[in-house]
Amino acid sequence: MLGESVPAAVEQEQLGEVKLEEEEAVSPEDPRRPESRLRPEVAHQLFRCFQYQEDMGPRASLSRLRELCGHWLRPALHTKKQILELLVLEQFLSVLPPHLLGRLQGQPLRDGEEVVLLLEGIHREPSHAGPLDFSCNAGKSCPRADVTLEEKGCASQVPSHSPKKELPAEEPSVLGPSDEPPRPQPRAAQPAEPGQWRLPPSSKQPLSPGPQKTFQALQESSPQGPSPWPEESSRDQELAAVLECLTFEDVPENKAWPAHPLGFGSRTPDKEEFKQEEPKGAAWPTPILAESQADSPGVPGEPCAQSLGRGAAASGPGEDGSLLGSSEILEVKVAEGVPEPNPELQFICADCGVSFPQLSRLKAHQLRSHPAGRSFLCLCCGKSFGRSSILKLHMRTHTDERPHACHLCGHRFRQSSHLSKHLLTHSSEPAFLCAECGRGFQRRASLVQHLLAHAQDQKPPCAPESKAEAPPLTDVLCSHCGQSFQRRSSLKRHLRIHARDKDRRSSEGSGSRRRDSDRRPFVCSDCGKAFRRSEHLVAHRRVHTGERPFSCQACGRSFTQSSQLVSHQRVHTGEKPYACPQCGKRFVRRASLARHLLTHGGPRPHHCTQCGKSFGQTQDLARHQRSHTGEKPCRCSECGEGFSQSAHLARHQRIHTGEKPHACDTCGHRFRNSSNLARHRRSHTGERPYSCQTCGRSFRRNAHLRRHLATHAEPGQEQAEPPQECVECGKSFSRSCNLLRHLLVHTGARPYSCTQCGRSFSRNSHLLRHLRTHARETLY
């Protein structure tokens, strides 16, 4: 227990600067106590330096400790995990080596993970400054001390933030457990400049009779053995050594105490801006330097600890050119505002070595670039994600779940952000207007795409468009092939095809292949094909594995990509979102619309060298050239029949599988092809879209119209369909189907067989007539 010599207000006297700062923050009209608005770093200092006082009693002392601890840890705002992290962080910083603790200055440390990442980044540096000496002359380390004493041959004047304050200096010495710190010797005061500390006159008394003695008494009277904080003794002794030199009159009313080294909370900067003549060091509060009187007779000079701040330099001579050997200056540097991060210390990724100034950016980089950190795996396609919420959104692409519905039109979306963008289309006025043509857009991205069209000069300036008019779909055209795109990003992806073809034709050396491999780092191990993005490689791998993770719930058909499933589902729903702005014809796919737009006078840069026919796309030209060469690369695995196009093969395979995906809504009749379904629907609606301009007669099919036009042809006029001649007998036919039926007579082929008796026929109609005999049905 402490003796009665310990004053009752020792706690308030020792940290009077801190309390005065808090009293300044609270206005005189505020009825609340200053302690009720303590910042965490202030409450932390009061909590650590609290001393038991006889007049308060044990219950009041315990209550005071609880109050200070509550202001420091803030259990109403922080969770148990956060409070534990604050305690662990404080202890972790106290056990760090001095040279590592010095490198952490200026960093807003919030948890132990940030400290670990910063220390790992320091160890990875090829070369860094040597360790700084933080040990006092007794050999005790004080890594968390806010006060260090340094003895040099001369003292210097350092500008401070408070005008004309007086402080006595104290000679540093090693204090034993029973020694009492020496009293400061009175010296002649010298006039000091504004903003500097000067030595006090001998008439002033210190704040307390001896903080060092108080701490020693606490240590001697403690019945609990060693302190749980090994650094408390050295730190508190140094703090008491400086506080002992301060008098209550020396504490300015508007003094701002340095922020706590742990960086808890943020300090409001003072209204008065402090001007410092020295260059700033770290953003942490630079430790207080006390220049001891090394020139005084009879006092041996002893080396002491250096300053923590790397930017703090030893002070030089005064303004008059003479060394201030007869006075001592206490240098107090205040951290201004929130600590600024040190640009030399950054968060480094342990996998690739990329550095980031913030921890949040490092975590986002690890989730995006390193799949090992993506612990949430999709069981359908094998794609991994860093968060469960992203996996939940991704699963909706497989299940086609669309929980967000528009209350105006009923359109459904997978994500709420997509619904928010869609709701902008229902608003009365557009939010973004084009400054050149006045056209309005609901989304900023649409306006940016529209402005790119103006910049490219691909089309003339458009007039302001009313809301009822549909916006044109194509904004950007490819200068190589004339293909149109709605987005500039799609055009950029398309231009890579031309660039790849050009590189392949121009250079075949190893250098060009090396450059192409650099642009396409993701290579397929089966076929060697390279891709620019990893997701493209994942989608390509399904071609080799045969995996089709996206299935249609209506017909059960599966696809390798989700975009293919979305396009396929429009077959069942009948949705055709892409309409031609000129003729109004609608299409299921955007590519079909782009192909259709070429029929309205679009550019056709690709020409056939044999017949001169022109095409708008290279794939259309390649498909047409197979009609000249007779090439049929697509073959049926069942019957071996060849086809020039994969679409024709898919249509043919439905004959073997019996699949008829297209059903009539009126009678339920099913068809293999959508064209047959469209032709059948005309029998219900009575539509006859093909009309003869000569007699006005209309037909359901275009073939019927062409056959009818042959009846109007004059003897010298060329018929709509030239006559078909048989190469065997020379017989001619007006229709190609009749010629094919006639050729069966010469070949003797009978492709239609009866499954019951095995009899074969040359025509399908003959087989149908024969089947009625088995069913005992007659036509007449």
Curated annotation (Swiss-Prot):
Residue ranges, annotated region (Disordered): 1-38, 153-237, 255-324, 492-520
Residue(s) carrying Phosphoserine: 162, 208
Post-translational modification: Methylated at Gln-483 by N6AMT1.
UniProt-recorded Gene Ontology molecular function terms: DNA-binding transcription factor activity; DNA-binding transcription factor activity, RNA polymerase II-specific; RNA polymerase II cis-regulatory region sequence-specific DNA binding; sequence-specific DNA binding; zinc ion binding
One matching Pfam family: zf-C2H2
Stretch forming the signal peptide: none
GO biological process: negative regulation of DNA-templated transcription; regulation of transcription by RNA polymerase II
Sites of N5-methylglutamine modification: 483
Main location: nucleus
Effect of residue 483 to R: Abolishes methylation by N6AMT1
Zinc finger (C2H2-type) boundaries: 347-370, 376-398, 404-426, 432-454, 476-498, 522-544, 550-572, 578-600, 606-628, 634-656, 662-684, 690-712, 724-746, 752-774
Biased composition (Basic and acidic residues): 29-38, 268-280, 498-520
Compartment(s) of residence: Nucleus
Keywords: Disease variant, DNA-binding, Intellectual disability, Metal-binding, Methylation, Nucleus, Phosphoprotein, Repeat, Transcription, Transcription regulation, Zinc, Zinc-finger
Phosphothreonine: residues carrying this PTM: 268
Biased segments, Polar residues type: 202-224
Domain SCAN box: 56-126
Gene Ontology cellular-component annotations: nucleoplasm; nucleus
Function: Embryonic stem (ES) cell-specific transcription factor required to maintain ES cell pluripotency. Can both activate and /or repress expression of target genes, depending on the context. Specifically binds the 5'-[GA]CGCNNGCG[CT]-3' DNA consensus sequence. Regulates expression of POU5F1/OCT4, ZSCAN4 and ALYREF/THOC4.
Subunit structure: Interacts with POU5F1/OCT4 and SOX2.
Annotated disorder: Otofacial neurodevelopmental syndrome: An autosomal recessive disorder characterized by mild to severe cognitive impairment, delayed or absent speech development, and behavioral abnormalities. Affected individuals have outer and inner ear malformations, hearing impairment, and variable facial asymmetry.
PANTHER family per UniProt: C2H2-TYPE DOMAIN-CONTAINING PROTEIN (PTHR24393:SF158), ZINC FINGER PROTEIN (PTHR24393)
Record's protein name: Zinc finger and SCAN domain-containing protein 10
